[in-house]
Amino acid sequence: MVLADVGGSISRALAMSSAAVVDESVLRECLNEIARALMQSDVRFKTVCDLQANIRKTVNLEALAAGTNKRRIIETSVGKELCKMLDTGKPAFVPKKGKPNVVMFVGLQGSGKTTTCTKYAHYHQRKGFKPSLVCADTFRAGAFDQLKQNATKAKIPFYGSYMESDPVKIAVEGLEKFRQEKSDLIIIDTSGRHMQEAALFEEMRQVAEATKPDLVIFVMDGSIGQAAFDQAQAFKQSASVGAVIVTKLDGHAKGGGALSAVAATKSPVIFIGTGEHIDDFDVFNVEPFVARLLGRGDLPGLIDKMESIVPADQQSELVAKLSEGAFTLRLLYEQFQNLLKMGPMSQIFSMLPGFSSELMPKGQEKQSKEKFKRYMTIMDSMTPAELDSTNPKLMTESRIIRVARGSGRKVKDVMEMLEEYKRLAKMWSKRNVSKLIPQNGKMSAQAIQKMLKVMPPQVVQQMGGKSGLEALLKQLGGGKDTSKMLAGMRGGA
């Protein structure tokens, strides 16, 4: 995420406050650096000035008693003001299971509205809802085809028409159909336009009047920066918008400006889109978001993300297999799948305290994903016996040649994958796994040392070596959360 650049700049600015003597000049330089970072993210000038003024009111260096941790006070004040800048203070509507929740999506053409409808449905489907999609966009050619393709891929029921041109009629018919089918989350995708025009707002009003949605969500392109204020305000006044989803925050420098501008309209942001994949869709909670920007991480969010991908029963099964020393190629394959589902690794790094998404150099993340997919392609050409075996010697030269031919890869690629497997299998052998999985909330020094050996050097350096890893495990709250993390992230070392 480009927003990570903003977070990196703010973190570096706060590092100035660790100077031997924190005086007025240090504070001024720190605040100026933060202001520059926010301005580069297209946050409004007045908003930045207000933030600086509020921090200065809180951090009165001359009035602080001797021995006071000035750096901590500055960090806390910056965090609070960033939260205030992004927080509307208004809770958004939350769908409830067991009753039909009707949600209507509105937005300008090109904002990613139709894709976001599917992401929203998919997110709630994983939470146990029974979602459905209605395409009431009759303005854009290909809108129904796009929704149909997305919904089919995500296995979500959908409704639309190639013949009917009245969006109100389609919306009502789709609503009735899915109510009869006991869908508890009916999502209506409406038409977009290239600009805010009267025809668009009138159509939205008619669809809303006919369907009486529980929530109207405005989907907004995050790349427009502070111009988001006018857009969000116009839609809020014309369509009774109850929540906002900001998209395209993975590749634009103006995301911070867009988020702060929307917050200024008092419209709560509930999700942010961070990529094109269906899982590149994150719940937006202000405090964890700011904590990630400041390098404090978001461990509850990370664990929740892992649990949504690896259910609790599968985690227990995984730990049981590892405890028996059964680290197979099939298990490695499943963990590669889990890692790919978790979204960008840079995003995962930002959720760990003391880390930053800047840790993942540009281009390296793509290479890592390509490597995972390459290994999975190779394993697709293996037999069940080969995938489930714990004996590395089973893969003889003739088998390796056969797998290479079947997967369309070179023999050296197969050898590389097998070496990676052997390294991980050795680490998660029955002898080692009991030492690595925390017991009674603690990990031994030997276990921590083993973890350090298998972690990439740049990661170890970023977290501050052994002491940094120990601090991270302490913040995880003991064995329970640490076990969840280990269960969710195995296979990606």
Swiss-Prot record:
CDD domains xrefs: SRP54_G (cd17875)
SMART domains linked: AAA, SRP54, SRP54_N
Subunit architecture: Component of a signal recognition particle (SRP) complex that consists of a 7SL RNA molecule of 300 nucleotides and six protein subunits: SRP72, SRP68, SRP54, SRP19, SRP14 and SRP9.
Cysteine disulfide partners in this protein: none
Family assignment from sequence similarity: Belongs to the GTP-binding SRP family. SRP54 subfamily.
Chief subcellular location: cytoplasm
NCBIfam families found in the cross-reference section: SRP54_euk (TIGR01425)
Keywords: Cytoplasm, Endoplasmic reticulum, GTP-binding, Hydrolase, Nucleotide-binding, Ribonucleoprotein, RNA-binding, Signal recognition particle
Gene: SRP54-3
Region of interest: G-domain: 1-294
Name recorded for this polypeptide: Signal recognition particle subunit SRP54 3
Binding residues annotated for GTP, in chain numbering: 107-114, 189-193, 247-250
Compartments, record wording: Cytoplasm; Endoplasmic reticulum
Functional note: Component of the signal recognition particle (SRP) complex, a ribonucleoprotein complex that mediates the cotranslational targeting of secretory and membrane proteins to the endoplasmic reticulum (ER). As part of the SRP complex, associates with the SRP receptor (SR) component SRPRA to target secretory proteins to the endoplasmic reticulum membrane. Binds to the signal sequence of presecretory proteins when they emerge from the ribosomes. Displays basal GTPase activity, and stimulates reciprocal GTPase activation of the SR subunit SRPRA.
Residue span of region M-domain: 295-493
Leader sequence residues: none
EC number(s) recorded for this UniProt protein: 3.6.5.4
Gene3D superfamilies: P-loop containing nucleotide triphosphate hydrolases, Signal recognition particle SRP54, nucleotide-binding domain, Signal recognition particle, SRP54 subunit, M-domain
Catalysed reactions, semicolon-separated: GTP + H2O = GDP + phosphate + H(+)
